[in-house]
């Protein structure tokens, strides 16, 4: 058994692991990374964010071809199979792996491929694919092993027509009808993707409103677009049992209803990848979803062990995970890079997409903050008209007395890009965070960014 000594060992090579390893390495520390795959990137690159967003992009291109009258001169609408569309995602995955492999090589991060677990508080044993065991001894260890779909024990996920958000990427055909159980972010994104491929989608939600953490107007807009695009949303429903049959799946609901489809996609919750880490050997406990508790420095109950990313729970976003990993390493190397990541933009890649940051109307009303609203509808924006993307809006919430920007909510074309302009202004100190920035700044024309100017004028016109 070979023994290696490091300053920092990072378990996992997803966004959190990458952020941690790169920050520690650039601070001059000797760093090792352990990943259970034979390639870096984690679930984000191989099963989650990257393939699903690449898949969504391809589906949007198909939708644009099929709905734009200009293309009728070329031919009639075309429908592509799910496996064909998935091929484009696979190309992106390989490029991402190559990029990240290069990052670690240039920064002298040693990467070990195998299953890593704690032997004690400073030792990780890595069982490689060939059976060889390596021992890594480190001053500090960062757990960034991510998460996987939560799988209830009473559902047969080995049935060929029952999938979760990881295994759906192995789907070898295009179903005519699909049940998506769970209307969280992942469920809504996949409902959009399959609807764009012409699949009839039954989206089962155990809550009374889609993505209830969003501004209610944005949530209602999403519901409207879903119902307009062959997605039937069933609210306040819970599964009783899932029955896999030869020609499909039957979902039995506690309300007594039954739904039959060609396949079922389970998207109801996630579980931290902690069950094979040997945490019992170091006294670190997890909650019912396998998640680790950390303090504001991302330190666990063991002084030299940290956690970051999906494995610690909220907000379970790739963007936040990277910053959490970077901050965990910042706590170790003390290079001024630490911050507690608690105010991140939400990016939801439905069709149309959604993004937001800051407070929503419900929260401001409950807190009795005197706010006002400014809106810009994309159907009136020149750039949206040119792009053939009239659906959507930008909504700015601001303090009616100080004009401080309190929240930005966007639904539609390029929403996840547009939100960052508002984020930049909201992060300015004191009086520099003001709605007046948008009316006193020249925006390129035509752009989607100028929606901020339109929304700001709309908001100012409401004041008296």
UniProtKB/Swiss-Prot annotation:
BP term (GO), one: 2-oxoglutarate metabolic process
Gene3D superfamilies: 3.30.390.30, FAD/NAD(P)-binding domain
Catalytic activity, reaction form: NAD(+) + NADPH = NADH + NADP(+)
Gene Ontology MF, one: dihydrolipoyl dehydrogenase (NADH) activity
Needed cofactors: FAD
Pfam families per UniProt: Pyr_redox_2 (PF07992), Pyr_redox_dim (PF02852)
Key words, A-Z: Cytoplasm, FAD, Flavoprotein, NAD, NADP, Oxidoreductase
Subcellular location(s) of the protein: Cytoplasm
Gene Ontology, cellular component aspect: cytosol
Enzyme Commission number, as recorded: 1.6.1.1
InterPro entries recorded: Class-I_Pyr_Nuc-Dis_Oxidored (IPR050151), FAD/NAD-bd_sf (IPR036188), FAD/NAD-binding_dom (IPR023753), FAD/NAD-linked_Rdtase_dimer_sf (IPR016156), Pyr_nuc-diS_OxRdtase (IPR001100), Pyr_nucl-diS_OxRdtase_dimer (IPR004099), STH_gammaproteobact (IPR022962)
Residues the record lists as binding FAD: 35-44
Comment on bound cofactor: Binds 1 FAD per subunit.
Job description of the protein: Conversion of NADPH, generated by peripheral catabolic pathways, to NADH, which can enter the respiratory chain for energy generation.
Recorded family membership: Belongs to the class-I pyridine nucleotide-disulfide oxidoreductase family.
Name by which UniProt lists this protein: Soluble pyridine nucleotide transhydrogenase
Organism: Pseudomonas fluorescens (strain Pf0-1)
Lineage of origin: Bacteria, Pseudomonadati, Pseudomonadota, Gammaproteobacteria, Pseudomonadales
């Amino acid at each position: 058994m070979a023994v290696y000594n490091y300053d920092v060992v990072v378990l996992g090579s997803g966004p959190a692991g990458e952020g941690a390893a790169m920050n520690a390495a650039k601070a001059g520390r000797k760093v090792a990374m352990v990943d259970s795959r034979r390639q870096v990137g984690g679930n984000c690159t191989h099963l989650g964010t990257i393939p699903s967003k690449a898949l969504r992009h391809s589906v949007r291109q198909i939708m644009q071809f099929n709905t734009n009258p200009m293309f009728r001169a070329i031919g009639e609408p075309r429908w592509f199979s799910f496996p064909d569309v998935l091929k484009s995602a696979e190309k992106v995955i390989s490029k991402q792996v190559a990029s990240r492999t290069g990052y670690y090589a240039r920064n002298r991060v040693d990467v070990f491929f195998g299953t890593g677990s704690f032997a004690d508080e400073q030792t990780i044993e890595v069982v490689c694919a060939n059976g060889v065991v390596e021992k890594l001894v480190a001053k500090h260890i960062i757990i960034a092993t991510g998460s996987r779909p939560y799988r209830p024990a009473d559902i047969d996920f080995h049935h060929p027509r029952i999938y979760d958000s990881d295994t759906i990427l192995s789907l070898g055909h295009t179903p005519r009808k699909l049940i998506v159980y769970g209307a969280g972010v992942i469920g809504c994104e996949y409902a959009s993707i399959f609807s764009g491929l012409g699949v009839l989608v039954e989206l089962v939600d155990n809550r009374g409103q889609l993505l209830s953490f969003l501004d209610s107007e944005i949530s209602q807009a999403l519901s409207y677009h879903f119902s307009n695009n062959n997605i039937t949303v069933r609210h306040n429903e819970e599964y009783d049992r899932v029955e896999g049959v030869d020609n499909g799946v039957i979902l039995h609901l506690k309300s007594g209803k039954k739904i039959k489809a060609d396949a079922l996609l389970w998207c109801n919750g996630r579980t931290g990848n902690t069950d094979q880490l040997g945490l019992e050997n170091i006294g670190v406990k997890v909650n019912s979803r396998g998640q680790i508790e950390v303090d504001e420095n991302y330190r666990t109950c063991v002084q030299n062990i940290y956690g970051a990313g999906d494995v610690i729970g909220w907000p379970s976003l790739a963007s936040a995970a990277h910053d959490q990993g970077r901050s965990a390493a910042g706590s170790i190397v003390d290079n001024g890079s630490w911050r507690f990541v608690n105010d991140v933009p939400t990016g939801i890649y439905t069709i149309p997409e959604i993004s937001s940051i800051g407070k929503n109307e419900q929260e401001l009303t409950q807190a009795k903050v005197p706010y006002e609203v400014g809106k810009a509808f994309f159907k009136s924006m020149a750039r949206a008209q040119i792009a053939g993307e009239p659906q959507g809006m930008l909504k700015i919430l601001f303090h009616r007395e100080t004009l401080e920007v309190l929240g930005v909510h966007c639904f539609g074309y390029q929403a996840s890009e547009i939100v960052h302009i508002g984020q930049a202004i909201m992060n300015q100190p004191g009086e520099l965070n003001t709605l007046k920035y948008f009316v006193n700044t020249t925006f390129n024309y035509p752009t989607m960014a100028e929606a901020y100017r339109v929304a700001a004028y709309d908001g100012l016109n409401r004041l008296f």
